[in-house]
Each structure stands twice: as C-alpha cells, then as structure tokens.
Design a protein with these regions (language model features):
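Aromatic-lined substrate-binding rim segments of carbohydrate-active enzymes
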Residues: 44-62, 74
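Active-site beta-loop-alpha junctions enriched in small/polar residues
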Residues: 9-11, 37-39, 62-66, 92-94, ...
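Active-site acidic/histidine proton-transfer and metal-coordination neighborhood
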Residues: 24, 33, 65-153, 160-162, ...
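Active-site mouth loops of central-metabolism enzymes
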Residues: 5-17, 61-69, 96-101
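Conserved beta-strand positions in the central sheet of alpha/beta enzyme cores
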Residues: 5, 35, 60-62, 88, ...
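Histidine-acidic metal/acid-base catalytic patches
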Residues: 1-28, 52, 80-83, 117, ...
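Glycine-rich, proline-tolerant flexible connector loops at the mouths of alpha/beta enzymes
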Residues: 31, 35-51
Length: 247
C-alpha cells in the first residue's frame, strides 16, 4: 500500500519558526511520513528521536548535489539516523543545463548512487521542467538522467505537465522505477501556478492507480508556493488525496 508523505520544503517558512511544532501538526493532519529538506540546524539524533516518538517515518532525504559530491558519508549517517532508506537529489544548477552538463551530472549521480547503495540506501533524482527542455542523445535530459545506473525517479506531476508532457503517459515506461512521486496540482488557468491537490487541472485518479500498481512507495504532497498558510494548503491536499485513495 502506497503511503502519504509531505515534502517539508513546502513548510519551510513555518519550520524556521517552529520546527518541532510543524512535525506535530503534520502528524495530526494524517501524514505517515515526511521527506526531509534540511534539519534547520537541529541535531539529527534529536530530530530522529522526536519523529520516532510521533510515529512519523522518513520517506527520503533531499540532498544537494554539492553534499552528495563533498560529504556523502555525512549524508549516509544522517539517513541512517533518521531511518530513511532513500536519498534524493532535488535539483541541479543552471550551469549544468546543457547536453554536456547533463552528461557530467549523470556521472556524478551514478557515483553517488553507487556509494549510497553500498551503504544500503537507494537513490532517486527529482526533476523540474528544465530537464524536459534540453535534449541529450535523442531524448530529454530527464530521460537521459533516469537511464543512469542506480538512478530511480522521483517524478513530479506538476513539473511534468509544466514541461509540456502528459504525466500519465510519461510514467508508463517507468513501472517499478518510481518509488517516490510528488503529487502536486496545477491551477486550471493561464497562470499554471502551484495548487492544492484536487483543486486544479491534473487528473490524479489514473496516475495514483498507476503508482499503486507500479510499486510507488510514497505519494508525497508538495506545493512550492502556497497562497496563504502552507499548513492550510497541505491540509487541503491530504484531505483530497485521501478521498482519491479512499483512505
């Protein structure tokens, strides 16, 4: 059964003010797990103990390419302490947004994946829309990166649609290779802005069914920008997502 998590980047402003209070609220809203986007200076052992007491699991850690390249042993220790089994690279800098840049990045990601695998951790890449705008060796840069050894996908439904792709169609070749999915809606207007799940233009039902059948472990709510209080936005998203999943 695919679980429901939240990407804590969504709640970054709230977490800066009340890190542990936000974790409590996330649990109260019904999230089973979180996807970490930094610990805001809190000791990892303290965070792990607090999350464990709440019963909040760790879906994954988002870790920058710089950290993967420069301090991967610390990343491994952090993941193990938090009880996470997956590490995700969330973004690559603009300097890499060219065919040669993506070729270099894939080598770095493959090296990180190999080191993480030896430590019992799986690796995924999270994309935006820019990887769909560049072609590498006859396919999009995203598809090129996902062809790398040891690189699973964290596919983001909003960014697939923003990049001009049909999310459900794009998913089809990746059955069994999308353990993490960012469930994110797009406003049904010309602005194509971020929206709470179930309030926009994305048809989630067939996508969620595909994920459940295709081995997705976590449906992860994320909203890069919220119109008001981000906790209110994720509350709407999880309520609608649970209805879609009959949870």
């Amino acid at each position: 059964m695919t679980g429901i998590a939240v990407q804590l980047y969504t709640l970054r402003n709230e977490m800066e003010q009340d890190f542990y209070g936000v974790l409590e609220k996330v649990k109260e809203l019904g999230f089973e797990a979180v996807e970490w986007a930094g610990l805001y200076g809190h000791p990892v052992a303290e965070v792990a103990a607090f999350a464990g007491k709440l019963g909040l699991k760790s879906a994954a850690l988002h870790v920058s390419l710089d950290r993967l390249n420069g301090e991967i042993e610390a990343v491994i220790a952090e993941a193990h302490a938090l009880g996470a089994t997956r590490v995700v690279c969330p973004y690559v800098d603009q300097k890499y947004h060219s065919p040669d840049g993506y070729r270099a990045v894939r080598k770095e990601l493959e090296a990180a994946a190999k080191t993480l695998s030896a430590a019992g951790l799986a690796f995924s890449y999270h994309h935006h829309d820019f990887e769909l705008a560049t072609e590498v060796d006859g396919r999009s840069a995203l598809e090129y990166l996902l062809d790398g050894d040891g690189i699973s996908a964290e596919l983001d439904l909003y960014w697939l649609k923003k990049g001009g792709r049909d999310p459900l169609a794009f998913l089809q070749p990746y059955a069994g290779r999308v353990p993490l999915m960012h469930v994110k809606d797009m406003s049904d207007d010309a602005a194509q802005s971020f929206a709470e799940v179930g309030t926009g233009s994305i048809d989630f039902a067939p996508i969620l069914a595909w994920g459940q059948a295709g081995g997705t472990e976590w449906f992860i709510v994320e909203q890069d920008v919220c119109p008001g209080n981000a906790l209110d936005s994720v509350a709407i998203s999880i309520a609608n997502l649970r209805k879609l999943l009959n949870k």
